[in-house]
Amino acid sequence: MVTFEVIKFKLLNSANYGVPQKRERVIFIGKKKNGKITHPEPTHSENGEDRLKKWISIKEAIWDLEDKEEDINFNHILTTHNSEFSEKIKNTPIGKSVFGNYSDAFFKAHPDQPSRTVKENHGGVFVHYKNNRVMTPRELARLQSFPDDFIFEGSKSKQLVQIGNAVPVGLARAIAEHIKKLL
């Protein structure tokens, strides 16, 4: 069993590390020996203050997929909705749920902000800000900062679970690079 002598934890927001998503996670960093423990410094901020880059918005992350045709090999799998549901989506304002009172389901994404936390539960959490449909696995993967050459395997629902359960790539990279400097 490994025993750590020094442990420090901090709440980190993925958007502060170049991820187009406001996903907050408590990150623990520990060392076996005495020494200073720090967490990675942010590279981005909400308004780009303190010489940091501005947070990346949903639109910046996925704009080029708006009119892209379905491509199963690229994980850009479109969902076909019935006309009644498509009309509901169309009439839902940005920042609101298609179902009104549900704060976390079928939320119409705000294009000019980072997204809410991408989760694995029910694949229709994010409604596209422009198109009357839920976001594709590839769009959600981009919100998790996965590179386009990372291909998810399995059914669409299994892809959504993999994407939603992942640590955002940009945050993981920032933490790993910082820990490497501490060694």
Regions found by a protein language model. Give the residues of each.
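Class I S-adenosyl-L-methionine
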Residues: 1-108
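C-terminal target-recognition/interaction regions appended to catalytic cores
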Residues: 65-183
